[in-house]
Amino acid sequence: GLTIPSVTAQAELMRAVLTLSGLDPDDVDFIEAHGTGTPVGDPVEAASIGTVYGTGRQQPIPISSVKANFGHLEPASGMAGLITAILSLKKADLPPMPLDFTPNPHIDFQKLNIVCAAAGMSLRDADVHTAGVNSFGFGGVNAHLIVQTLKQPVTDRDQTAQILPPLLLSARSDAALRDLAASYADYWESAEPSYYEMAYTAA
C-alpha cells in the first residue's frame, strides 16, 4: 500500500547519515530535495530538512529539486537527483527551476531556515562543497545520502604508484592499431593530458 511521509523518520535518517559521514549540518551547502510535488510530501520533507539542517544555521540552507524541470521520473527520480547534485557540486552552482515555479504555500521557509533556490544560485566560496540528496518512494523508501567534492584534485604529480596503469588499445588490424597508437602519441604531445585520465578513458 501507499505510505504517508514522516518528518521524524526523515530527520532521523538525515542525522544518522551525518553521523556516519562525520559531518555537521553546517558542512552541507545545499539539499537536492526529492520534491514530491504533493500537498503532504513537500511540507513534510521541508520540515525534516529544516529540523536537521536549518536549526542553528546562520544562513538558510538552500534546497532545490531538479524534478521541477521535467517531472517525477518514478523509479529514476533518485538517480536524477544524485546526478544533479554531483553536477551542481562540480560547477559550484545550483540550476534554476522553471520560470512559473511557485514554492508550496504550506511551507514556512523562514521558520525552517531554508530557502528555495528556484532562480538558481552559486555556492559559497569554499575548498570543499557538500550536498545532501533525498529520495523517497510510495512503498516507504526513505533514502538520504551525502556527496562531497575532493579537497584537492589528484594530478600526476600526486600519484605515488610506482607502476603505471596500462594504456589499453584495440583495433581490427595491425595497421589500424598503429594508427590509433600514433593518434594517442600525437594527443599526448599536443594536449599534455593526465596519463591516468587517458588510460582510464581508453580502458
Listing of model-derived features with the role each one plays in the protein:
Residues 1-169, 175, 179, 190, ...:
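Condensing-enzyme catalytic core of the thiolase-fold
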Residues 183-187:
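Conserved short hydrophobic interaction patches
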